[in-house]
């Protein structure tokens, strides 16, 4: 559960200032209804600029600017115990990355993306080697990331066999292997489904990887098991070539 993870990480709070992240204890809950206007942040001593509206700023970490989240009404009794995991995209002012919030929208933990491109996706808590961990996907360059309960990176890897990993799923199995999804375009005659003869089909691929070594333990291709005429999809109409005939969104074991 989220409570189990956050209990485990409490001892590592002092580590955060050294890792490019920010952490703080959540404030006491309040039943007050807040304004729907974007939060405003005051100028900070020693910081040569005033943070834009809608962006958090921290005295100890002026280099961090996660987007502020305004909660108009707290659902105190309707939500499960714990925190909210989100992965905001980079905005005009706020940074993109992985973020944990309380139910008032206060930042508990934030890890900005290390590059200027891409997005963090699919932030969640999982179990690895019997311990709670945070996992997410960084779309550029397509890396899968694991942090331990002290917010330290313990694994980072990519899809294997020359493929680029997809952001839809990263699941750690009960055997402590990684299950990931891939989309790969292969040449395909689409005349039977209303497309051109010389076109592409986007197939779904599943890989099971050894997290430590990156070795492929299992690989499954939709094109080997599901015929094109079984899809409900039609050839793409938005200027992209081919057909997205087998679209994997999640994995379950």
What are these regions (language model features)?
Residues 9-12, 16-18, 27-253:
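Histidine-/acidic-rich catalytic cores in large beta-rich domains
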Residues 2-7:
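N-terminal export leaders
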